[in-house]
Amino acid sequence: YKVDEDLQGAGGIQSRGYFFFRPRN
C-alpha cells in the first residue's frame, strides 16, 4: 500500500487514505 499512489487515486483516499489523510475536497 503506497501512500503516493493512493493519494493520487480517489479510491485509495476514500477507502484507506481517508484514515491517514483526510481529503479537503
Swiss-Prot record:
It holds the Pfam family NMU. GO terms for cellular component: extracellular region. Its main location: secreted. GO terms for molecular function: hormone activity. It is found in: Secreted. It comes from the Eukaryota. InterPro entries: Neuromedin-U_amidation-site, NMU_C. One of its GO terms (biological process) is regulation of smooth muscle contraction. The modification Asparagine amide is found at N25. Keywords: Amidation, Hormone, Secreted. Belongs to the NmU family. Stimulates uterine smooth muscle contraction and causes selective vasoconstriction. This is Neuromedin-U-25. It comes from Gallus gallus. The gene is NMU.
